[in-house]
């Protein structure tokens, strides 16, 4: 689903920017002391397990939007 994938990528990018602002950097293994995290890569380079985590967050967000009574309608092509 295009919207789920777009939201999942955004979720990851927002998370990564937050970590970077907190001083975290990429590292092959998570290291709290050195503030290294293997997930600090572009979304496209994540493995499917990590992408699925972000997709789950995106789906949860879409469910909340629907529960609140909103609908998402794509733009019509001109």
Residue positions per predicted region:
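Alpha-helical propensity feature that highlights long, continuous alpha-helices across diverse contexts
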Residues: 1-78
């Amino acid at each position: 689903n295009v919207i789920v994938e777009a939201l999942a990528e955004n979720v990851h990018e927002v998370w990564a920017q937050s970590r970077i602002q907190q001083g975290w950097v990429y590292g092959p293994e998570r290291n709290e002391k050195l503030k290294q995290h293997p997930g600090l890569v572009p979304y496209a380079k994540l493995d499917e397990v990590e992408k699925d985590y972000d997709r789950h967050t995106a789906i949860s967000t879409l469910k909340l939007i629907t529960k609140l009574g909103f609908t998402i309608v794509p733009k019509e092509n001109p």
